[in-house]
Amino acid sequence: MSRKLCTLNFTLSGKQGSLVIRDIQLWSNRPTASKSTSELRGQFIQYVDLAKLPLWVRSTNMNTYRCYSTSATAQAYFKSKLRNANRGIVIELSDKVDQRSQEPAYLIIFRENTELNCFQVDLTMKHEFDGQVTKLKQEIGKTRASVSKEGSIDIIIQQSQQRKIGTKTKVYRNVHINDKRLQFNETLSKLILGGLRLRGISNSITDYQKLYKITFDAAEFTHRDELKRISMGSVEEVSFESLQETVETLLKLFTKS
């Protein structure tokens, strides 16, 4: 039997100020010890691609909660932002912490078919990884401290291995940068083509290619600062919403009769 666990309200911060998404009810099919319902407060962090989340984010025995809301604002928000089935919304809970690390706790809200669900990010495996890495670093430090002149060949081998790792890291970094730029180009192209179709502009129309190209070039110029930072290895990405807004603005300008 389903039981209401709590109600979640979280804040969206934007250029026009803050908007609070209210009355998100979390329900569970699993029995719980507590009979009362609580109210959680949170802050929107970012959107994520569920298919690209690390394996440690979700454990096999974790709870998934069903989400409901009677708020028209909340319903419209989720309908707009979760059109893509792989997209998730990350919420940092303001008044709840991870029991092991005492770090903030996080919820990820997502859509599964027509249902709205969420789960709490499981940090247990991450902490285990962090502990193993710390232990390994300590062991390496002790080994280096005990190396004598007779062990100089080991140092040479280790330095050679580190150089190889550094080269691989650099190659990986370049591949990652290229992937981000390719993703930007693909998303931008799809948005432009979709915008042209919505306006009834067929590729058989004269200057179709010219209109596509000037829109593409203008969008690149608009986001030149973000693209420059990406080319320098930044982890940030040009958000889908920002790129969509840019394309819509440009097409309105270029197709104005």
UniProtKB/Swiss-Prot annotation:
Cellular compartment(s): Nucleus; Cytoplasm, Cytoskeleton, Spindle pole
Lineage summary: Eukaryota, Fungi, Dikarya, Ascomycota, Saccharomycotina
Record's subunit section: Interacts with SLD3.
Leader sequence segment: none
Protein name: Mitochondrial morphogenesis protein SLD7
Source species: Saccharomyces cerevisiae (strain VIN 13) (Baker's yeast)
Function: Required for the proper function of SLD3 at the initiation of DNA replication. Binds to SLD3 and reduces its affinity for CDC45, a component of the replication fork. Required for mitochondrial morphology.
Major subcellular site: nucleus
UniProt record similarity statement: Belongs to the SLD7 family.
Keyword Nucleus: yes
Highest taxon of the lineage: Eukaryota
Alphabetical GO biological process terms: DNA replication; regulation of DNA-templated DNA replication initiation
The entry's keywords: Cell cycle, Cytoplasm, Cytoskeleton, DNA replication, Nucleus
